Amino acid sequence: MSSLYSKLIDDLMEEISKMEKGAKLPSERQLCDDYKVSRTTVRKALGYLVNSGILYQVQGRGTFVRESNKENLSNYYSFTEQTRKNGKIPKSLVLSFDVRKASPEECEVFEEKEGFKVIAFTRLRLADDLAMMYETSLIPYERFKEIDKKLLESKPLYDIFEEDYKSKIYNIKERFSVSSMTSEVAKTMNLEDKSPCLKIRRLSYDLEDDLIEFTLSYARADLFYY
C-alpha cells in the first residue's frame, strides 16, 4: 500500500469523524485538489472506505457518510470502556501466554500457510475484582513478537497495537451467540459448570486489511452489559 493512499485514508477518516451521518463528501476532483493526490488514489481510498462500511455511494449523486469513524469503531464491545462507564475498575489477568505454531484451523482463519506462528494468550477480565469475561486471543508472532505477559496486563491490547506498533484497527467483525461455559471457563470464573454465557467471536483488521487479532470471549450472562 502506497504511503499516499494510506495517508489519504487516515486524513479522510479524520474528516469523516467530524461529519454527520448522511453528509455528502466533496467531489473526487475537489478531494484531489484538497489533498494533492491523483484521482486514482482518491478512488481507491473511497473504495476502501465504502467496502469498510464507513461510506456509501449513490450513482450520479456522490459519496456519503454511512457512519462516522468514531461511531463505527465504538460499535464493537470494549470491556475496558464499558466497565468504566459502569463506574467500575477494569483489570486483566493473563492466565496463559505462549508462542506456538497455529493449528490448521487457525492458519485458515489468518489465511496463512502451515508453520505460521502466533502469540496465544488467555485473559480473565475483571470489574472491581469480579470475574466478568474469559478470553482467548491469537495475534501474529512475527508482527508483535515484543509483546509479553507484563505488557498485556499493563494496558489494553488495542492501545498496545496503536501506541507501540502504530497499528490502528480499521475494521472489526464480531459475531455474538448464546452459549454455555465449559468446565475450564466456569471453574476459572468461579461459576457452575455450563453456566449461561454470551460468546463473542472477534476478527480485527488493520488499514491494509490484514487480520491482526482473533479472539473468542465468554461473558457471564447474569452480569454482562453491552
Q: Which residues does each predicted region cover?
A:
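Extreme N-terminal segment that seeds HTH/winged-HTH DNA-binding domains in transcriptional regulators
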Residues: M1-R39, K85
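Conserved hydrophobic residue
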Residues: K21-K24, L55, A131
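Short glycine- and basic-residue-enriched patches
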Residues: E28, S74-K88
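Beta-hairpin "wing" of winged helix-turn-helix
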Residues: G53-G60, R66
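C-terminal all-alpha effector/ligand-binding and dimerization domain
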Residues: P90-Y226
